[in-house]
């Protein structure tokens, strides 16, 4: 009889702790389970949420890697289009000046320099501004279009005009200009080629605007995820 009245070891061990089964927990334990009106998660809930949090973080990093890859690929495509524009400019001005010498040298410079100019300019004026968040959508599209026009058409055209003009004078493939009309003479020689460059000009402006808009939307995705819905 005395043995039945004596509390068991397990009951005495969990005194002050939430009791098992249908037995109700003490009042102080109930109050301790609540903090600022919210139930404190148990150890089981924490273990359950831990893989979920890890999965969410992993998905965030995966989205970041995908967005960064798309950004790099878009910039490289934009630079490649400037390179193609430089090749076309070199071809047009070589035909205008009737130059058939040093083709590899001129094509190498007209292929690589516009790419580098486009990528560096886009990095300085668009990508850095997007990462800092100090640029609007309209400004981003405008800057990208101007970079396409300047680095994708104007710079390759001026470079091709200069290099092939020097070769034309060096090898005397065209008549030398009279005194006082040097610039007019060269412009008349290559006016057909300058008109042909209107095609890559339009293409580079559209390409730049599309690239800027695309990268703006990519950079706005993470910010939109951080803003809670009303």
From Swiss-Prot:
Location relative to the cell: Mitochondrion membrane
Keywords assigned: Chaperone, Membrane, Mitochondrion, Transmembrane, Transmembrane helix
GO biological process, one term: mitochondrion organization
Parts of the chain that traverse the membrane: 70-92, 107-126, 139-161, 196-218
Similarity-based family: Belongs to the TMEM126 family.
Functional note: As part of the MCIA complex, involved in the assembly of the mitochondrial complex I. Participates in constructing the membrane arm of complex I.
Stated name of the protein: Complex I assembly factor TMEM126B, mitochondrial
């Amino acid at each position: 009889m005395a043995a039945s009245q004596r509390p068991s070891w397990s009951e005495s061990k969990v005194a002050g702790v939430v009791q098992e089964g249908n037995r109700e927990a003490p009042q102080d334990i109930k109050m301790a389970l609540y903090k600022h009106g919210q139930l404190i998660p148990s150890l089981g809930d924490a273990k359950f949420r831990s893989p979920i949090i890890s999965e969410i973080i992993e998905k965030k990093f995966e989205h970041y890697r995908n967005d960064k890859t798309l950004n790099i690929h878009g910039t490289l495509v934009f630079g490649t289009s400037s390179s193609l524009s430089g090749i076309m400019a070199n071809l047009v001005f070589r035909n205008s000046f009737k130059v058939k010498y040093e083709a590899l040298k001129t094509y190498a410079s007209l292929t690589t320099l516009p790419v580098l100019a486009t990528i560096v300019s886009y990095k300085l004026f668009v990508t850095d501004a997007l990462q800092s968040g100090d640029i609007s959508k309209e400004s981003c599209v405008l800057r990208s279009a101007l970079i396409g026009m300047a680095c994708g058409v104007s710079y390759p055209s001026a470079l091709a005009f200069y290099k092939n003009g020097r070769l034309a004078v060096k090898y005397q493939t065209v008549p030398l200009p009279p005194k006082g009309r040097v610039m007019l003479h060269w412009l008349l020689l290559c006016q057909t080629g300058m008109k042909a460059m209107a095609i890559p000009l339009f293409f580079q402006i559209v390409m730049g605007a599309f690239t800027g808009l695309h990268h703006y939307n990519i950079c706005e995705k993470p910010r939109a995820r951080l803003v809670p819905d009303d």
